[in-house]
């Protein structure tokens, strides 16, 4: 079975192929906003519309397959930016209609988790999902991923990106801020707002910008911001590990590329006897392979729809989605 996956939730348009549960590959292009500006949804959508045809041709050519070989089409149905999501949905819908094949709507966050489980050969982990749009600590129980901690406002990646943009550090913000902080010789105290098992990151950005206006060296702010953000996440993760007693801790999403975050979470995992596994860099950011892979497992369990019902959902909680295929990844 050959599955084509389409990812277009935010700044990246990406297509991937999965054959019989194995990832063949992916291609993608990222919309980079003008310096000092955030992502404009319609401009991102225009970018995706322009890039999609050539990406599809390139992907098929690279792997020696024809469009007619595709058996199932999967697309990221949400959450995400409405105009960007619709570009991917329209592309997937058009291909499904042309080929007369099923179409599978995929939750973007769950796809991040499944590609991480696949790539790290994990079965039943506690998952730390961290990206521009997600900050969630989750674990499987009773048909769904249950949330053991999450952000109350903006995601960790978004918070750091916003500071990077205002400070003129460029995009993407997380690696830029981490590089900026490497030369710092000290830390300044940051607020670390944690409410129960939930975190608030919006205030960290505001506080960092306040320090910048007060003349605190940029490198010191960058290092302190990153340390505060990551240690907040580590505290909530540690509590979740103590509660769930999971033996695996999987780190997924674009921010999983952070070497400093890996160090901190590795210490948490070691303390609780959990093996820490980090998604490979090639699958950390938004990618079509994760959509195709999740679509493959979903379709095998009877989860699909018709082109007429292939809608998008800008807001879509991760714990609102059944994952009947969960144990299938343990039996590969």
Swiss-Prot record:
A biological-process GO annotation: tRNA threonylcarbamoyladenosine modification
Positions of substrate binding = 129-133, 161, 178, 258
| Record key words, sorted | Acyltransferase, Cytoplasm, Iron, Metal-binding, Transferase, tRNA processing
State a GO cellular component annotated for this protein.
EKC/KEOPS complex
Residue sites binding Fe cation per the record: 108, 112, 286
* Cofactor requirement: Fe(2+)
Q: What are the recorded GO MF terms, alphabetically?
A: iron ion binding; N(6)-L-threonylcarbamoyladenine synthase activity
Q: Per its UniProt entry, what is the enzyme's top EC class, as one word?
A: transferase
**Which Pfam families does the record associate with it?**
TsaD
**Catalyses which reaction(s):** L-threonylcarbamoyladenylate + adenosine(37) in tRNA = N(6)-L-threonylcarbamoyladenosine(37) in tRNA + AMP + H(+)
Q: What subcellular compartments does it reside in? A: Cytoplasm
Write down the PROSITE patterns for this protein, in alphabetical order: GLYCOPROTEASE
Family note: Belongs to the KAE1 / TsaD family.
Q: Its function?
A: Required for the formation of a threonylcarbamoyl group on adenosine at position 37 (t(6)A37) in tRNAs that read codons beginning with adenine. Is probably involved in the transfer of the threonylcarbamoyl moiety of threonylcarbamoyl-AMP (TC-AMP) to the N6 group of A37.
* Protein name per its UniProtKB record: tRNA N6-adenosine threonylcarbamoyltransferase
The scientific name of the source species is: Pyrobaculum arsenaticum (strain DSM 13514 / JCM 11321 / PZ6)
**Per UniProt, what is the name of the gene that codes for the protein in this document?**
kae1
């Amino acid at each position: 079975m050959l599955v084509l996956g389409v990812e277009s939730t935010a700044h990246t348009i990406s297509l991937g192929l999965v054959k019989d549960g194995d990832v063949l590959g992916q291609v993608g292009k990222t919309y980079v906003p003008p310096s000092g500006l955030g992502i404009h949804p319609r401009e991102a959508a225009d970018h995706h519309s322009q890039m999609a045809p050539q990406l599809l041709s390139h992907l098929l050519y690279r792997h020696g397959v024809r469009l007619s070989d595709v058996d199932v089409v999967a697309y990221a149905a949400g959450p995400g930016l409405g105009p960007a999501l619709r570009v991917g949905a329209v592309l997937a819908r058009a291909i499904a209609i042309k080929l007369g094949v099923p179409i599978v709507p995929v939750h973007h966050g769950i796809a991040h988790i499944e590609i991480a489980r696949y790539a790290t050969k994990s079965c039943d982990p506690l998952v730390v999902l961290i990206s521009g749009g997600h900050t969630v600590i989750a674990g499987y129980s009773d048909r769904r991923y249950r949330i053991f901690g999450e952000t109350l406002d903006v995601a960790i990646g978004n918070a750091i990106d916003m500071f990077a943009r205002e400070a003129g550090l460029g995009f993407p913000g997380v690696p830029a801020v981490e590089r900026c902080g490497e030369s710092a010789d000290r830390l300044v105290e940051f607020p670390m707002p944690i409410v129960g098992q939930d975190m608030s990151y919006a205030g960290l950005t505001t506080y960092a910008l306040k320090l910048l206006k007060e003349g605190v060296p940029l490198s010191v702010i960058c290092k302190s911001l990153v340390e505060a953000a990551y240690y907040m996440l580590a505290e909530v993760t540690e509590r979740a590990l103590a509660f769930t007693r999971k033996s695996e801790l999987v780190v997924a999403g674009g921010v999983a590329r952070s070497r400093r975050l890996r160090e901190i979470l590795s210490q948490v995992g070691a303390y609780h006897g959990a093996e820490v596994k980090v998604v490979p860099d090639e699958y950390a950011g938004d990618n079509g392979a994760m959509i195709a892979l999740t679509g493959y497992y979903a379709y095998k369990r009877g989860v699909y729809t018709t082109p007429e019902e292939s809608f998008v959902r800008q807001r879509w909680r991760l714990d609102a989605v059944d994952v009947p295929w969960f144990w299938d990844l343990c039996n590969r």
